[in-house]
Structure formats: structure tokens, C-alpha cells
């Protein structure tokens, strides 16, 4: 049995030689730490020709950006590996491949995606991958349908829910999405110039009631095995290709949470684009984001509907029209969760480069206000936004 230790670069090389599945392991000679996240060490392993061949990822026992004063369970590495393995089973074309996992060392070996780019960085530059939103919709439909009650036998579903209980990581989500932004808290981070906007969140009783309902759904609706953190920084893209990574927040929760988080990150980019591009380029890129949102939802809903028609095993859930009614509830959830993503990324602990890297301070503050205003509106009126076209109309209204 392995005993946990924090990997050095040389440890990562030796581990990749043993478990990387490379025909000639001796060609692996160097590791470079590339992780910019808060929770893990990530090493790219290079061969003698300087080509990156494999990735080694190890969970740390604390939140990196805070330090050892915020400890974290190492079991999240098991949950991430098992979530990605399950998602790969149902959607291999859009899920990173896990070659090996060691629960004692909290380390996994996975495919290298050096020929891809992180989607967030591409979106900030104004680069458009026309197929990416449809591919993300396909990933969400395949992974969420095949881990839901529509497809799984009830006994299997209940056993999987137990396997994927992830209380410590869920608590982080519960705090950062549903608690911190609506109270004075030391984890919150925002410029003093928007204090009035943030104070308005804390005093908005209608908003806080709607957020409470969303948190309750996050607590209690074990609908499918979520990725749990499906933002544009956890997605790699290349021409015609897309892969999801980083699933340590995976657990059985409301389907609308994954869908809403994905849409929310596209809207965060929408809000930040005027701070990165000229007027015409920003306007064009914003239209691309709205197209992305429409294609993401339409692909997800259409594919989920087809899968439900063809593969639903439960007799009651096969009732004509039920899948459509279920998707209406998923949509309403998604709009609300989307709003919480917009707000928590603007005023909470974890921000996004789409807005934080805007050089002009006044423009950055304006983009933050835009995200907060849009997020508030979506949370409060989620049940009145009945279609993706209505969502896009609302986004235009608040822009």
C-alpha cells in the first residue's frame, strides 16, 4: 500500500514511467508543473524529444491558494477519477482519458491534451470554435442521461449515489455559490468601487429566497452524476474537438447545475468581452456567445430527448411527454444556477480571467456590475424564462 507524499517533478516522471502506458517508458525524462488551480499539483511529462506525452495529477490535502489552514479530503481524487471514468464510458469523445489512479497517493495519470487549448483563454481572445458548444451539449446529454433514473436500474442508481457522496467538495460549492456572496464574509473578494452593488445582494430578500430554493435543490436532487464544475477553464478545445477535465466536484445532483454552470461561464465571457476587444470585435464575439448558448442548450435538450425515447428503462418515465416536462424543470434550474455562477464569480473567492484580466479598472468594474445585474435577474425570474430564445432576449435587455 502506498503512503501519501507530495510529488516532486522526479516523482511524477517515475510514476508516469510505471503507469503511463508508454511503449518505451525510458523515453520519459522530464516533468514540468503546469497546474494553475487551487487544489492540485499537475505535471506534464516530456520525452527525450521534448514532446509532452502524459499528465500526472495529484490532489493536495489543502486549498493551495489559502494554505494548510483550509484542509481538504484526499478522497476527492478518487471521486474525480471515478467521475471521469464514468463520463468517459458514456462520452469518450469529449472526456479526458484516465490511464491509472492510486487512491492512497491521490494521484492519477491521464492523457495529454497539449494539442488542445483551454477554452476560457480562447474565448477571451475572441477565438470561436463553432462546434464547441454543440460538443459540450452532447457531453452533458450523454453523461447526465446515462447516470440518471431514466437509464440506470434503481438499485444501481442508489449504489452509485452512495459511491459518489462528496460532502467536503459539495460544502465548498454550497458556500461559494449560495452563502458567501449574500453575506459579509472574509472569502469574498471584489473592488471597493462595487460595494454598493454587493451590499444590494445582501439586502435583497426576494433574491435570497430564490437562492435558498436553488441551494435546497443542490442539497436534495440526486438526478445524475454531475461534473460539478463544468466551466470554460475545465474544458479543452481544438479544431473540431472538445474534452472535459477536472471533475473533483463530481457528485449526484440536479442536472440543471451542470447545464447552468456551463451557460453561466459563456455569459461571464459575454460580460467581459468589451474589456478585451475593440467595439466591433467585442460585439461580434458577443453574438457568438449567444449562438453558443443557444446551440449548447438545443443540442443538450434534443439529444437528451432522443436518448430518453430510445433508452429509458423505467415504465413510468417512458410515459409520452414526460421527458419533455422534465427538461422544462431542468431548464428553469439551469437559469437559476447560471445566475448564481455569474454572481459568485464576480464577488466571491474564485473569479474568472474573462473579467479579472481586464486592464482598464473602470471597464472591469462595469463588467462586474453587468454580471451581477444579469445574475440577479436570472435567479429571480428563472421560472419566467421559458426558452433559450427568451434567455437571449433577457441578456440583450440587460446589456
UniProtKB/Swiss-Prot annotation:
Coiled-coil ranges from the UniProt annotation: none
Catalysed reactions listed for this entry: 5-(methylsulfanyl)-D-ribose + ATP = 5-(methylsulfanyl)-alpha-D-ribose 1-phosphate + ADP + H(+)
Pfam families in UniProt: APH
Keywords (A to Z) from UniProt: Amino-acid biosynthesis, ATP-binding, Kinase, Methionine biosynthesis, Nucleotide-binding, Transferase
Keyword presence, Metal-binding: no
GO biological process, one term: L-methionine salvage from methylthioadenosine
Amino-acid positions noted as binding ATP in the UniProt annotation, renumbered to this chain: 40, 57, 111-113, 246-248
Broad class of enzyme this protein falls into: transferase
Family affiliation: Belongs to the methylthioribose kinase family.
Name the record gives this protein: Methylthioribose kinase
Organism whose genome encodes this protein: Citrobacter koseri (strain ATCC BAA-895 / CDC 4225-83 / SGSC4696)
Gene that this polypeptide is encoded by: mtnK
Amino acid at each position: 500500500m502506498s503512503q501519501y507524499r507530495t510529488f516532486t517533478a522526479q516523482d511524477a516522471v517515475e510514476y508516469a514511467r510505471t503507469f503511463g502506458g508508454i511503449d518505451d517508458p525510458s523515453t520519459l525524462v522530464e516533468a514540468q508543473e503546469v497546474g494553475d488551480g487551487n487544489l492540485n499539483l499537475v505535471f506534464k511529462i516530456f520525452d527525450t524529444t521534448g514532446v509532452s506525452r502524459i499528465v500526472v495529477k495529484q490532489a493536495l490535502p489543502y486549498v493551495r491558494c489559502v494554505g494548510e489552514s483550509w484542509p481538504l479530503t484526499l478522497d476527492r481524487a478518487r471521486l474525480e477519477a471515478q467521475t471521469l471514468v464514468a463520463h468517459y464510458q458514456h462520452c469518450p469523445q469529449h472526456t479526458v482519458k484516465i490511464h491509472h489512479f492510486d487512491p492512497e497517493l491521490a494521484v492519477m495519470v491521464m492523457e495529454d491534451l497539449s494539442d488542445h487549448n483551454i477554452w476560457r483563454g480562447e474565448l477571451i481572445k475572441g477565438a470561436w470554435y463553432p462546434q464547441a458548444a454543440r460538443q459540450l451539449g452532447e457531453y452533458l446529454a450523454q453523461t447526465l442521461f446515462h447516470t440518471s433514473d431514466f437509464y440506470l436500474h434503481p438499485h444501481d442508481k442508489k449504489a452509485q449515489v452512495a459511491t459518489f457522496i462528496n460532502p467536503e467538495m459539495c460544502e465548498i460549492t454550497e458556500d461559494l455559490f449560495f452563502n458567501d456572496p449574500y453575506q459579509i464574509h472574509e472569502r469574498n473578494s471584489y473592488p471597493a468601487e462595487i460595494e454598493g452593488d454587493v451590499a444590494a445582494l445582501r439586502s435583497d430578500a426576494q433574491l435570497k429566497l430564490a437562492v435558498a430554493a436553488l441551494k435546497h435543490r443542490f442539497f436534495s436532487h440526486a438526478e445524475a452524476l454531475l461534473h460539478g464544475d463544468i466551466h470554460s477553464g475545465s474544458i479543452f478545445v481544438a479544431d473540431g474537438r472538445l474534452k472535459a477535465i477536472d471533475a473533483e466536484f463530481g457528485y449526484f445532483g440536479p442536472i440543471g447545475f451542470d447545464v447552468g454552470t456551463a451557460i453561466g461561464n459563456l455569459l461571464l465571457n459575454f460580460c467581459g468581452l468589451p474589456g478585451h476587444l475593440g467595439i466591433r470585435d467585442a460585439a461580434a464575439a458577443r453574438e457568438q456567445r449567444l449562438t453558443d448558448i443557444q446551440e449548447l442548450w438545443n443540442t443538450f435538450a434534443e439529444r437528451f430527448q432522443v436518448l430518453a425515447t430510445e433508452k429509458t428503462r423505467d415504465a413510468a418515465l417512458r410515459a409520452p411527454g414526460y421527458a419533455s416536462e422534465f427538461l422544462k424543470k431542468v431548464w428553469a434550474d439551469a437559469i437559476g444556477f447560471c445566475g448564481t455562477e455569474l454572481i459568485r464569480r464576480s464577488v466571491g473567492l474564485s473569479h474568472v480571467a474573462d473579467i479579472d484580466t481586464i486592464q482598464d479598472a473602470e471597464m472591469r468594474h462595469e463588467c462586474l456590475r453587468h454580471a451581477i445585474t444579469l445574475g440577479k435577474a436570472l435567479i429571480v425570474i428563472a421560472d419566467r424564462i421559458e426558452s433559450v430564445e427568451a434567455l437571449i432576449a433577457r441578456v440583450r435587455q440587460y446589456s
